[in-house]
From Swiss-Prot:
Its EC number is 2.6.1.37. Belongs to the class-V pyridoxal-phosphate-dependent aminotransferase family. PhnW subfamily. This is 2-aminoethylphosphonate--pyruvate transaminase. The gene is phnW. Homodimer.
């Protein structure tokens, strides 16, 4: 039984280990050399998780939610005369479009249904037709539904057509193996409170050094200037430009150590995959069908279609919370769904307990 009051079956914030929580019981100074050395270690560890070609990449940590880091990239990487192609099939792709529009960046959209992956044929057609496109952005795991998008194919097109590639790997990095050098990803974005299993408070950008250097002077925001943030961390040994979330950084460092102890990203992926497979099998036994086709389904979060007309999600939510579980409502408009996350400090025995509770007739009518 997990020691938390509630087991969060969500895509982040998520259930963390007791040891991750415990390191936040102490106070830390942002100017302390030991703390800044830890920041540098975190940055280096993230690059080593992302690629074998570590010398080509660097990490920028950015205060705030993961969305802050996405906006830092969109607002800093694309020049005034640039044009962004966004692949969208959910809320987080749409959010990138909204950012670009608010920042007055020219944007082209390749949109598919929320339960369908990015259409590679359409993406290539847009690249062929619009020579002004300079950058491509795609969400790896769209947690609106739990679908995985074909970033390998998107990045191949980016390389083929000479575009800068931006991958929002918010809910996949650390839980699904990615080598950003092999894929020729220029900017990868994620967050502390996802598959690394830290707590909310900062996001991070793993950037190709050559591309990051081109961003100098392009920032459209003071606090979200990606280049300036990186330059300060580089020149001042891990110093953040503005107050950093010291407790969150320590928790994240501990979470990185625990990821290594678990056996790395592949071992964590296997646990998440087994959680998700068990969840779908057991939920199927009691009448719940997943929204996303299994060939596109991530191990991160699963959307389930309401089992019958008149099903009340709030009843399910309240009952599960009474049993110590917290799940997510659906986030799409065309199909009634709810979502169950498979990541965090969650194990097969937790999934079995969850479905046992759902199987009790009170929560499904």
């Amino acid at each position: 039984m997990n020691e938390n009051h509630y087991l969060l079956l969500t895509p982040g914030p998520l259930t963390t280990t007791k040891s991750v929580k415990e390191v936040m019981l102490y106070d830390w100074c942002t100017w302390d050399d030991e703390y800044n050395t830890m920041v540098q270690e975190v940055r280096a560890k993230l690059v080593s998780l992302a690629t074998k070609e570590e010398e080509k990449y660097t990490t920028v940590l950015m205060q705030g939610s993961g969305t802050f880091s996405v906006e830092a990239v969109i607002g800093s990487v694309i020049p005034a005369n640039g044009k962004l192609l966004v692949c969208t099939n959910g809320a987080y792709g749409k959010r990138i479009v909204q950012m670009a529009e608010m920042l007055q960046i020219d944007v082209v959209i390749s949109q598919t249904e929320e339960w369908e992956p990015t259409n590679i044929v359409e993406v290539e057609k847009l690249l062929q037709e619009d020579k002004e496109i300079t950058h491509i952005a795609v969400v790896h795991c769209e947690t609106t539904t739990g679908i995985i998008n074909p970033i390998v194919d998107v990045c191949k097109l980016g390389q083929q057509y000479g575009k800068v590639t931006i991958v929002d790997a918010m809910s996949s990095f650390g839980g699904i193996e990615i080598d950003i050098a092999d894929l020729q990803i220029d900017f990868l974005i994620s967050s502390a409170n996802k598959c690394i299993q830290g707590v909310p408070g900062f996001g991070f950008v793993i950037a190709k050094r050559d591309e990051l250097l081109k961003c100098k002077g392009q920032g459209r925001s003071l606090s979200l200037d990606l280049y300036d943030q990186w330059e300060t961390m580089e020149k001042q040994n891990g110093k953040w430009r503005f107050t950093s979330p010291t407790h969150v950084v320590h928790a994240f460092y501990q979470a990185l150590l625990e990821l290594e102890k678990e056996g790395g990203v592949r071992a964590r992926y296997n646990r998440y995959y087994n959680n998700q497979k068990l969840l779908v099998n057991r939920m199927g036994e009691i009448g719940f069908k997943p929204l996303v086709d299994k060939k596109y389904q991530s191990p991160i979060i699963t959307s389930f279609i309401y089992p019958k007309e008149g099903f009340e999600f709030q009843q399910l939510y309240n009952e599960l919370k009474r049993y110590g579980f917290v799940i997510y409502p659906g986030k799409i408009s065309k199909v009634d769904t709810f979502r169950i996350g498979n990541i965090g400090d969650v194990h097969e025995e937790d999934i079995n307990r969850l479905v046992d509770c759902i199987a009790k007739g009170a929560v499904i009518g």
